[in-house]
Swiss-Prot record:
Family annotation (PROSITE patterns): G_TR_1, G_TR_2
InterPro entries referenced in this protein's UniProt entry, alphabetically: EFG_II, EFG_III, EFG_III/V, EFG_IV, EFG_V, EFG_V-like, EFTu-like_2, G_TR_CS
Name the record gives this protein: Elongation factor G
Annotated compartments: Cytoplasm
Source organism per UniProt: Allorhizobium ampelinum (strain ATCC BAA-846 / DSM 112012 / S4) (Agrobacterium vitis (strain S4))
Primary gene name: fusA
GO annotation, cellular component aspect: cytoplasm
Keyword tRNA processing: no
CDD domains xrefs: EF-G, EFG_III, EFG_mtEFG1_IV, EFG_mtEFG_C, EFG_mtEFG_II
GO molecular function annotation: GTP binding; GTPase activity; guanosine tetraphosphate binding; translation elongation factor activity
Purpose of the protein: Catalyzes the GTP-dependent ribosomal translocation step during translation elongation. During this step, the ribosome changes from the pre-translocational (PRE) to the post-translocational (POST) state as the newly formed A-site-bound peptidyl-tRNA and P-site-bound deacylated tRNA move to the P and E sites, respectively. Catalyzes the coordinated movement of the two tRNA molecules, the mRNA and conformational changes in the ribosome.
Record keywords: Cytoplasm, Elongation factor, GTP-binding, Nucleotide-binding, Protein biosynthesis
Family: Belongs to the TRAFAC class translation factor GTPase superfamily. Classic translation factor GTPase family. EF-G/EF-2 subfamily.
Binding of GTP, residues: 17-24, 86-90, 140-143
Domain tr-type G intervals: 8-288
Length: 699
């Protein structure tokens, strides 16, 4: 089966916004007008097609990114293929949005015309900046009371530090909103209410908007000619670019992320959606317009590029795992190069495992279509993959590449979680396992002593959302304990310990003597074992027992029972007995030897230090820095980003609980922060004494 659409006619884009700016409604209208939906799904009546989990339809919010493929004929009469990702905007925790942005070529940022740029808009905008995603802006809800298009334009400049190129002006506002002025064609589009937005009339610009239209067209041309020397020169000499040239310049500037074309309308009242679809065709990039994806060649370890070309070897990135009630586990993948056939064997280069593609599905929200083949630029859902998780690369087994090594750091915070009722017990286990499969930075374990279920993650917020998703998606009610920080212990100086284990009680006894040097491991946090035995004072077959004995006690340090990091042990001497010695005897001896030595080798408590990035408007910088210092934070630096200031700091995790609430009240909800584990650092002695007192009583 040959490719149906040329790759230059693909548009892979997402819709990003603050909660309630109308993302799902806008996507619904796109599906309706592009012919994928026979009935307009309304979030208000629980029929939206993109929101296909029951909980989403009940609540009118989008929980998971649903991917859908649809088609649209642009103004030039050419059909384009759209792969759309609908992303959630309702959570602080925006890993879903990040995952989507990594595999998209462009995005539409939705604004609520009443609220303008809201805090979550700032967050997703910054994420898109990070991945350099070309964006257009759609000022939605123009029919709402208090809708103000011009204020939204101003807020894009002041709040986001971005340049919006206004492409349309609204005709009327609030209940009087009728249509838009097209600033390129210089005409008016007025929608007919009775046609569900399918029909509109092209008329002259209303008299009261003529002057404003001329002013904004002038601004539009001034902005776009700046990116092209020849156009700029012509403009300064009084030669105006024609409409095709203006469109070409808008496209170039959008793809180069120099500015963002801005449109307006009301998806709910079916006005302004079709021109937005035309704009997706005209201004957002195809996979050919963006730089080739870089990867690591598995054979040579050198950097290579994969281009969006069917003739290149297959490479794709798994960006989301979803559980489908009918098909089971689905792995959503973006194909960057080559082509994929159903039943093909692919290599997961991250897990170093081969996978077979069972079924290949084209997703339309909650309905699915089996396909035999997929090509570069496609976003597909694969069924039947056993090993693959988020961030894995799948590729041609003969041309192996790793597209993006994703680091999933060790969890730094854990809480005990218990089901509220007996009936929730089994459901909770299932829910936690499913959530762990979807999110590699989340872990589940059982505490051996108490039998409690412990969930661990990257921060307080992360675990809050896991518990919330469990309740919402799996209907499991659970009680959670107080968060616990994952402290560690280490030793700070060299110490030599000589220990003899002797046990005689009739029959065969036990005997083993070990002399071991313990010291900090200069190579990192791992445990390192070495043997310098010469002359057979400890026979070769007993040496693994010595190593095993030490390893068995590293999980509980001498200060407060936390796991130990960065220990090096060197066995230098010992003694054995022909009859009474055994591997077990040497294991017991080395275990006791280490316990004795750890107390004398300068045992020290370590705490997880988080790399914290706060993005705040300038007005709040002093307060934010003062607050971080009061949390034992070390400021690493600050820089300007647009009109915001980015503050980087290392802060102990123990002092970051409830930080999100503090930051919100400090900045009136306008600052955001992100936090990742960075390294373990010694705990100051006064704090260490408190921690030891608290945890020693529990051990």
């Amino acid at each position: 089966m040959a490719r149906e659409y040329k790759i230059e006619d693909y548009r892979n884009f997402g819709i990003m916004a603050h909660i309630d700016a109308g993302k799902t409604t806008t996507t619904e209208r796109i599906l309706y007008y592009t012919g994928k939906s026979h009935k307009i799904g309304e979030v208000h009546d629980g029929a939206a097609t993109m929101d296909w989990m029951e909980q989403e339809q009940e609540r009118g919010i989008t929980i998971t990114s649903a991917a859908t493929t649809t088609y649209w004929k642009g103004r030039d009469g050419k059909m384009r293929r759209f792969n759309i990702i609908d992303t959630p905007g309702h959570v602080d925790f925006t890993i879903e949005v990040e995952r989507s942005l990594r595999v998209l070529d462009g995005a539409i940022a939705l604004l609520d015309a009443n609220a303008g740029v809201e805090p979550q808009t700032e967050t997703v905008w910054r994420q898109a900046e990070k991945y350099n995603v070309p964006r257009m802006i759609f000022c939605n809800k123009m029919d709402k009371t208090g809708a103000d298009f011009y204020r939204s334009v101003e807020m894009i400049k002041t709040r986001l530090g971005a340049t919006a190129v206004v492409m349309q002006l609204p005709i009327g506002a609030e209940t009087e909103f009728k249509g838009v002025v097209d600033l390129i064609e210089m005409n008016a589009l007025v929608w007919r209410d009775e046609s569900l937005g399918a029909a509109w009339d092209v008329t002259e610009i209303p008299d009261d908007l003529k002057e404003k239209a001329v002013e904004y067209r002038e601004k539009l041309i001034e902005t776009v000619v700046e990116i092209d020397e020849q156009a700029m020169e012509d403009y300064l000499n009084g030669i105006m670019p024609d409409n095709d040239k203006i469109r070409a310049l808008v496209r170039q500037g959008t793809i180069e992320v120099k500015f963002h074309p801005m449109f307006c309308g009301t998806a709910f009242k079916n006005k302004g959606v079709q021109p937005l679809l035309d704009a997706v065709c005209e201004y957002l990039p195809s996979p050919l317009d963006i730089p080739a994806i870089k990867g690591i060649d598995v054979k040579t370890d050198g950097e290579i590029e994969r281009h969006p070309d069917d003739a290149e070897p297959l490479s794709m990135l798994a960006f989301k795992i979803m559980n489908d009630p009918f098909v089971g586990s689905l792995t959503f993948c973006r194909i960057y190069s080559g082509k994929l056939e159903k039943g093909a064997s692919v290599m997961n280069t991250v897990k170093e495992k081969r996978e077979r593609v069972g079924r290949m599905l084209q997703m339309h929200s909650n309905s699915r279509e089996d396909i035999e083949e997929a090509f570069a630029g496609d976003i597909v859902a694969l069924a039947g993959l056993k090993e693959s998780t988020t961030g894995d690369t799948l590729c041609d087994p003969l041309n192996q590449v790793i597209l993006e090594r994703m680091e999933f750091p060790e969890p730094v915070i854990q809480i005990a979680i218990e089901p509220k009722t007996k009936g929730d017990q089994e459901k909770m286990g299932l829910a936690l396992n499913r959530l762990a499969a979807e999110d590699p930075s989340f872990r589940v374990k059982t505490d051996q002593e108490s039998g409690q279920t412990i969930i661990a993650g990257m921060g307080e917020l992360h675990l809050d959302i896991i518990v919330d998703r469990m309740r919402r998606e799996f209907k499991v009610e659970a009680t959670v304990g107080a968060p616990q920080v994952a402290y560690r212990e280490t030793i700070t100086r060299q110490h030599e310990e000589d220990y003899t284990h002797k046990k005689q009680s009739g029959g065969t006894g036990q005997f083993a003597r070990v002399k071991i040097i313990f010291e900090p491991n200069p190579e990192g946090d791992e445990f390192k074992f070495d043997s310098k035995i010469v002359g057979g004072s400890v026979p070769k077959e007993y040496i693994p027992g010595v190593q095993k004995g030490i390893e068995s006690v590293l999980s509980s340090g001498p200060l407060a029972g936390f796991p130990m990091l960065g220990v090096k042990a060197t066995l230098i001497d010992g003694a054995y007995h022909d009859v009474d010695s055994s591997v077990l005897a040497f294991e017991i001896a080395s275990r006791a030897c280490f316990r004795e030595a750890a107390k004398k080798a300068g045992a020290q408590l370590l705490e997880p230090m988080m790399k914290v990035e706060v993005v705040t408007p300038e007005d709040y910088v002093g307060d934010v820095i003062g607050d971080l210092n009061s949390r034992r934070g070390q400021i690493q630096g600050q820089e300007s980003r647009g009109i915001a200031v980015v503050i980087n700091a290392h802060v102990p995790l123990a002092n970051m609980f409830k930080y999100v609430d503090n930051l919100r009240s400090m900045s009136q909800g306008r600052a955001q922060y992100s936090m990742v584990f960075d390294h373990y650092s010694p705990v100051p002695s006064n704090v260490a004494a408190e921690i030891q007192a608290k945890y020693s009583g529990q051990k």
